[in-house]
Amino acid sequence: MEEQTLIPADQLKAHFWDVFIVDALLENFDRHNGNWGILVDEERQTAEIAPVYDCGSCLYPQLGTQEMEAVLNDESEINRRIHEYPTSAIMDGGAKISYPRFIASLQNEDCNQALERISARIDMARIETLIQQTPGLLPIQRDFYRIMIRARKEQVLDCGMEQLLRAREQRPDGPVEQGMTLF
């Protein structure tokens, strides 16, 4: 992040954490250093971060409709797909980190701030409308995406926000950062 010169490092770091939170919501298991984009306009000599780049590993792309139906019919399978996998491609100590555990741990203040920024902007009604209006989706796919995104929002992001708000109440004068720094 510090090595590139096109985008101010603090802006890039904030964007990284915003995307991390969105990836947690959309179950992206493959966000790594090779799939970020910077839009460069050589004529104007400008550069900006691509708002969306390489999200092909979101929303269980290899899950067939029969598997989706099986997941929706088994609460323990829904919970496994929320709490056990997918994991982030980001590694800590040689292991991929768990989105729910990392977010709820509050161990990175940049992540905490992104959680606040992004959670405030998530409009589930608009997301569900988008899913309903997406052409080509089968009813089971619509149900699966709607249920899984809502469950991840409630059990990952909303739970993380509850933890963060409690921590901020206990320590109103400063960050609640508890440890790990990825940058």
Predicted regions: what is each one?
Residues 1-64:
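Conserved kinase catalytic-core segment
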Residues 41-183:
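C-terminal catalytic region of ATP-dependent kinase domains
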